[in-house]
Every structure is written in structure tokens, then in C-alpha cells.
Amino acid sequence: MVVKFTKSEALHKEALEHIVGGVNSPSRSFKAVGGGAPVAMERGKGAYFWDVDGNKYIDYLAAYGPIITGHAHPHITKAITTAAENGVLYGTPTALEVKFAKMLKEAMPALDKVRFVNSGTEAVMTTIRVARAYTGRTKIMKFAGCYHGHSDLVLVAAGSGPSTLGTPDSAGVPQSIAQEVITVPFNNVETLKEALDKWGHEVAAILVEPIVGNFGIVEPKTGFLEKVNELVHEAGALVIYDEVITAFRFMYGGAQDLLGVTPDLTALGKVIGGGLPIGAYGGKKEIMEQVAPLGPAYQAGTMAGNPASMASGIACLEVLQQEGLYEKLDELGAMLEKGILEQAEKHNIDITLNRLKGALTVYFTTNTIEDYDAAQDTDGEMFGKFFKLMLQEGINLAPSKYEAWFLTTEHTKEDIEYTIEAVGRAFAALANNK
């Protein structure tokens, strides 16, 4: 059991003097779980972390999803080391980027052409530009609660109604940009239709997380994605899948392969980099030919397609091609789900658990979670207490009630068994303090 965070606390105090908020991404702070110093990690191996105080954790954060093969996987580490020895940045075409592009196309047939960038935010941002160039329209639709990166183009919240033009969700985002975004509830065909009836003639594209990962793991209702394609295409707009979280996480070919629905454009990131910074986007040939140097939609990047990220990504996909890997993730996920639900019943703790294969979210509520409104209406204070109890048990989770638990290929049944026991102790403590 973890008992001290002395060095993490000291390091955070020092970080506050030099780094904004002491963190380089706000999701890493503990603000959403009651505050305190975030735990600083020193090294990772397989399914485990060790912090600066020497405490060991079973990791279910997985860097918010990318580390599907576990930390410091030897095949990926070797590829990165070799790339570093050969020079990590050229500013020229390489054989590695061609090989990796071919691998992505083979995995995801909807990608006639691809282009590499440096992050999921960049990938989404550019698909929007390409969609606007192709359609000649300006408005974008998205689903409430679905995060598509921190660019001005999509950092908006829903208004008071389902088809209301967006309002900025961050200082510094001009109202003029936010007004180009229309937000509708996920899993609701009727409100989508209403919005398209009103704004469809101005809409360039709709951004879709085919399986939601940013207000927990939420699957689309049967037939929902098919209806999205139908309605959006009828309006003359494009369908963009944001598979930054989902690609290669639930199935090798991404959510579009798992669900059997094809988008016009796809944004990728996270898993495809094997832990290094990366993004990619692609889609139908006639749409992608809008991108410079072939077309008028400009996109460039000094670091785009750098050899280190290409080598890491290739190695990661090679690992993910191993037979039985996704079946193992599903099996461990089912085992963890069953154990958590049993512990909740045993200790009379109200939870709803959403799981798809090797990813799940525990919500402190009895309500079904199918959209963002339902996810918001869950007990964040209870989650914060649970999070810190699990940290004391040596279990590393994301510090937010909206985030998923991600399994890796390196988790074992013994890890799951210990985690279930730890959940039981945490639930017992919560029950005693009700």
C-alpha cells in the first residue's frame, strides 16, 4: 500500500514556480479530484509505474490511451533507439513514412491517402480545413462532450438547445469562430435531424467519435452511426471520424472496422505513435487531393513524419498484429468489469460501468450513460475520494470522473485480481464514510 508522496509533493511545489499550474496539461492536475499534488512518475515498465517516492502502481491511465502495448515495450524501444542513432529529424521524405502510410492504409480501407502530423489536435484541425475546402462551406457539427483537441475550431460548448450555435468553452476563443460550430447530443437522431434541417446547407462536416472516449466509454446506439452518415450526406456534408482514441485500441482496423461504418475523413493519433508524438489524417482520394501540394488546402509541419515517430509507430502496429492480442484485452476487461460490479454490490455502492473490450469507465450513479448530460450528472466528489483511495492501493487511474481505464497487453490476470481486491477495499471505505 502506498503511504507517502513526499517527493511528489516537493516536486509539484517546485514545478509551480516554473511551469504553469505545475503541469503541462491541465488533465494531469488533481483539480477534478479534490486537489493536491499530482503524483510524479519516474519510470514505467509493462503495466507498471514507479513514482519519485519509489511507490509502485498498476497503471490504467496508459497515458490517456496510447500505451496499449505497455511501457517500454522492447520491440518499440529498439525501434526508437535505432531511429535515434540514425538521426531523429531530417526535414526530407523517408522510407519509414512510406512504410507506415502503407500499414495504416492496409489497416483502414477508408484511407485512400494519408498525411502525417504531430498530434491528434493537428489531425482534427486539418480534417476540418480539408472538409471546408472540399465543400466550400464553413460550419462544423460536433456532439456535446466529445473532445477533439484544443484548437479554436472545436473548443466550444453546446448552447441552450440541441441545434444552437456554439459558445466559446475557453477564454481566447473568438465568438466568431465558435459560431461556426453546431453542437448536438450524442446518440440522438432527432436532434441531429433538427440541426441539419436548420443548418445543413452551411455544414461542411460533422466530427464524430464513433465510440466516445471523452466523457467515459460510450457506445453508439444500434444504427446511430449509419443514420449520421445518411443524414449528413443528404445535407451534402462530410463525415469525419475522430479515431484519435479508438483507432487500434478496440480493434486493429479501428472503430470503423469494428462497427462497419465508413467515414469520408479520419483523424488519428495516440496509439499509432507507440508513445511518441504523432497524428495522421486521411480519407477519400478526391477529398485528400485538396491538400497542398496537390490542392489549395495548406498544411505543413517541420516535425511531421519524423523518423523517430515513424519507427515507433511501425513497431507498435507490428506488435498489435500479434494473434489473440485484442481477445486478451477483451477477456481481461470482462474480468475486471465483473469484479468491480461484484464489489459494488457487496458494499452497496451505486455505480454504472460502461465497457468495450479493454477500456471501461466507472460512473458513480445508477443512471444509464448514453450521452454527455448523463455523464455530467454523476457524483464527482465520490469519484475523487475513490481515486485517492485507489492511489493509496497502488492503482493509477486518470484524475477525472469522465476518463476511461485503459488495459494494456502487459496486464495480467494477477493484476486484475489485485485491482478488484483494491476496489473492494476502496468501496468499503466509501461505504463506511457515507
Curated annotation (Swiss-Prot):
Complex formation: Homodimer.
Entry's localization field: Cytoplasm
Annotated positions of the N6-(pyridoxal phosphate)lysine modification: 270
GO molecular function: glutamate-1-semialdehyde 2,1-aminomutase activity; pyridoxal phosphate binding; transaminase activity
Listed pathway(s): Porphyrin-containing compound metabolism; protoporphyrin-IX biosynthesis; 5-aminolevulinate from L-glutamyl-tRNA(Glu): step 2/2
CDD domains: OAT_like
Top-level lineage group: Bacteria
Main location: cytoplasm
Keywords: Cytoplasm, Isomerase, Porphyrin biosynthesis, Pyridoxal phosphate
Name of the top EC class for this enzyme: isomerase
Family matches, as SUPFAM superfamilies: PLP-dependent transferases (SSF53383)
Catalysed reactions listed for this entry: (S)-4-amino-5-oxopentanoate = 5-aminolevulinate
BP GO annotations: protoporphyrinogen IX biosynthetic process
A Gene Ontology cellular-component term: cytoplasm
Keyword Isomerase attributed: yes
NCBIfam families tied to this protein: hemL (TIGR00713), PRK00062.1 (NF000818), PRK12389.1 (NF009055)
E.C. designation(s): 5.4.3.8
Name the record gives this protein: Glutamate-1-semialdehyde 2,1-aminomutase 1
